[in-house]
């Protein structure tokens, strides 16, 4: 599809960018003296859901779903954005499979937007009709079910499905920018996992369940470094294109994770400046996702009386 076919969609997103919350607003939100004051600020910004509830999750439930529906309406090629939300389908697969195993309701833990109706995943797994699911998730659903039913190890199951999620994201990434973004995200996730596993001194087998192949890191070398210790992973990072993040990894895995997300947002910040193509739409969705995450942190902080400085340490950069 020609990039010029995105001209209308890009112009539409440009107009919407002015509605994104900026750092100034978040500073005001965190400086509020009460949860009720924070709610009023959000209601004034258009978050009418806060008028009827103090449940942060409930109020923000439709936040990203509305963003997704809007982008689907204006995007010439509906599939080009699929790689952005496929992680929710794998989250839903985890919730539903565990629900089946424990005879509990997994549906209530499912996320939207997603590519597959959660009920369809539930029926496929419950009836073991895994082939009813799209190819990018069917084998994972089958193997994951077998893994969980035989081991009843929820952590191992989570690792396996999360790896499958990264593989699917790379598979569904359609254009050069999407492929770069998906591969970079996978590489940074692999490094984050290696840092945490190295610190914990986990069994070597777990690395094979957790690390996902990608172009920007060699997972065999990363695994080898992690097995030698945390500091060796930091040294490995210094030899990759993510060398600028090594100093944060030296502080902690959490500090690396925060700054790796900011690294991805920097890629997206450059992408949104492109005049034609899907890149600005991808960047807009990611910006809304970062905004949503920061909202949860900020509103929760005000609700429980967490100091603003502590909340800001957990928040991610915004591109507005």
Segments from the language model and where they lie:
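N-terminal domain-start signal
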Residues: 1-320
